[in-house]
Regions:
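Conserved N-terminal structural module of periplasmic/extracytoplasmic solute-binding proteins
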Residues: 2-114, 127-132, 173, 178, ...
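Extracytoplasmic/periplasmic substrate-recognition and gating elements
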Residues: 77-79, 313-381
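Short helix-initiation/N-cap motifs at beta->coil->alpha
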Residues: 82-92, 191-195, 279-294
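Alpha-to-beta junction loops
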Residues: 96-109, 210-213, 294-302
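Hinge/lid segment of periplasmic solute-binding proteins
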Residues: 108-169, 173, 321-325
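Extracytoplasmic/periplasmic solute-binding protein
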Residues: 146-152, 157, 194-250, 297
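Glycine-centered hinge/linker elements that transmit conformational signals in sensory
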Residues: 200, 244-283
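Conserved C-terminal helix/tail region of periplasmic/extracytoplasmic solute-binding proteins
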Residues: 373, 384-396, 405-474
Length: 474
């Protein structure tokens, strides 16, 4: 903050002139006034940006960004709409029925599967700042060589862990980890499912000694939490299966390869947990956040986007680290974090031309101005794929980047973007909860084994069924 008492009137005047010049430069250069988009300097006569934001946790920040953009661009018109969680596509489908001056101009798809649904609305981004500001243009989703969607954030997920709790555990007699002071970090000690299970089982056995409720946070099946398992955890067996079978793109069918490895890691989550399986159906994402942030659990499956919630709940940045999710696959000691994006921006080609131009002007400012870069990288905590962006002020992003940078580590691809439908995910989710509840009589009881067999059929046979349904539509 500038302190007025320490500056002379002349210095203040100079600063005011500099600020005005910078704002003017941003408004007339960096904000997209170029022949490429046919913009003009009379912004009040221009179009409107209607941004359909996908991430509810960033709603207030996007409103701030819109207000700041309007403040330094008198006459600019921008509206941020944020559908409720799990209703994005339904609300978007309704919104694009509006006339061209009122329909969304900037919206999100989740990758190739989403593009198949929305390709009739996606504009060619060849001349858009969204595409031209990418640090690696190969990240864009293309159709016949034309960029149609651009990832605005690359994210990582894995097992977030509490460093302070693991350090306390490592100091216990006969613990399964050595203190990091001995020269080997926790993430370099836990590099396989076998080691993770050994540590988690011992943490659970000694939970009273450590003052925790369990090794893992609750695997809640409320809609605020279940996506962590039906989508992100399910990615792990699919990734190894696709890698083994050299699958590219979306397959019409899958196999049973590695599905039982899915069971191994999920069993660990629910047996070494803060919560009995009988309560999982109502446990929420917020419950898991608080269990972890308050030191009641050591491990929490989530991603880099979770830092805001964790920080707001009181955990310190120096107390968090991240491990890959191990499932007992051969060669997993070389595995990095699950890294990718299901967050692609598209410009709506059915919106009016003036609204598309206004949207490109807004994006130019967002991706090149200091304020826009700070909003994306720091306030929203995104690891962005655009040119000349600062590192995100997010310890989970840094932990993931540092781990994946280790020699020989291979990031796990987000193949879940090829899942055939939400119906497939929901069927897997329902059967996964049924299985969890069946384990009350033992992880390998007859009821649990039967429930798992049902899930495997939903996983494999359901994929082929949902793929046929999705691709039979004209």
């Amino acid at each position: 903050m500038w302190k007025g008492s320490m500056m002379s009137r002349s210095v203040k005047s100079i600063i005011a002139l500099v600020v005005c010049a910078v704002l003017a430069a941003c408004a007339f250069t960096a904000f997209g006034f170029s022949k490429s988009f046919g913009a003009n300097t009379d912004r009040s006569a221009g179009g409107k940006v209607i941004f359909f934001n996908f991430k509810p946790e960033g709603k207030d920040i996007w409103i701030d960004v819109a207000n700041e953009y309007k403040r330094i661009n008198p006459g600019a018109d921008i509206d941020v709409k944020t559908p409720q969680s799990n209703s994005y596509e339904d609300e978007l489908r309704d919104a694009v029925k509006n006339n061209p001056d009122a329909m969304p101009t900037l919206f999100q798809i989740n990758g190739p599967v989403g593009y198949a649904k929305w390709k009739d609305y996606t504009a060619d981004l060849t001349n858009s700042p969204l595409y031209n500001q990418l640090s690696n243009k190969g990240l864009a989703l293309t159709d016949n060589g034309k960029p149609v969607a651009v990832p605005y954030v690359t994210e990582n997920y894995g097992l977030i862990y509490n460093k302070a709790l693991l350090a306390r555990y490592a100091d216990l007699h006969n613990s399964k980890l050595k203190p990091e002071e001995d020269g080997v970090s926790f993430e370099d000690q836990i590099t396989t499912f076998g080691k993770l299970k050994e540590v988690a089982d011992d943490l659970q056995k000694r939970k009273d000694e450590l003052g925790i409720d369990g090794a893992f946070t609750s695997a809640g099946f409320d809609s605020s939490s279940d996506w962590r398992f039906k989508t992100h955890l399910a990615n792990m067996p699919l990734y190894y299966q696709f890698t083994k079978n050299k699958v590219n793109g979306q397959p019409s069918s899958i196999t049973y390869d590695y599905v039982d490895n899915f069971r191994k890691i999920f069993d660990l989550y629910i047996s070494d947990s803060t919560t009995p399986v009988s309560q999982l159906s109502t446990k929420t994402g917020e419950d898991a956040v608080y269990e972890f942030a308050l030191g009641k659990a050591v491990f929490y499956q989530n991603g880099t986007w979770a830092w805001g919630d964790l920080a707001n709940s009181g955990i310190k940045s120096e107390d968090v680290g991240m491990l890959p999710i191990y499932i007992g696959a051969k060669g997993e000691e070389k595995q990095g974090m699950a890294t990718g994006s299901e967050n692609y921006w598209c410009i709506n080609k059915r919106a009016s031309k003036k609204n598309q131009e206004a949207t490109n002007e807004f994006l130019q400012c967002l991706l090149t101005s200091p304020y826009g870069k700070d909003a994306l990288a720091n306030r929203l905590g995104f690891a962005t794929p655009f040119k000349k962006f600062p590192k995100a002020d997010n310890p989970l992003v840094q932990a993931a980047v540092d781990y994946t940078a280790k020699e020989g580590k291979v990031p796990v691809t987000w193949v879940f973007v090829t899942m055939p439908s939400n119906g497939w995910k929901d069927d897997v989710d329902s059967d996964l909860l049924t299985y969890a509840q069946a384990t009350k009589d033992g992880m390998t009881s007859m009821g649990a084994n039967q429930a798992w067999d049902t899930l495997k059929k939903a996983f494999v046979d359901g994929w082929e069924k949902e793929y046929k349904i999705a691709h039979s539509k004209s």
